[in-house]
Amino acid sequence: MIGRDFSKGEDRWVVDQDFIPRRSSTASVVIEGVQQGEDASLYIMWTKIGYPPCSKVVPVMVDDVPRELQPDPLTWHSPLCDFVVEQKHKVFSIKRGSGKNYIDMDLLKEIMKQQSTISQENYKKGYIKREEKAKSLKK
């Protein structure tokens, strides 16, 4: 809206306004379907659970939900989501006044860089898993 890329700027504190992910966002999901004739079990849900900018991409297939996304038997929380929410609280660390609306961009950039590296690996792993499953279905 204002034509600025805050990820490249030098401002440390930025108001969380007019961004696609909001402080209240709980996940970002993309469903990758299959082509006509392919088995529906080859669908992949690419998930960033918790506050998306602090999360990593995790591939989820119909019959394989990664342990880090499954609920803990005591808390019924996803361990990954709890970790990501902790990171979000660090990024939105100001508690007084309107501080809850300010993002620490220095910390967010650091977290996003780490999570991006992990996400790239997870994309590769997800596609390999999908290819292996597709081959096993053809047997």
Locate each region found by the language model.
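C-terminus-biased signal that marks the final domain/tail of proteins
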Residues: 1-139
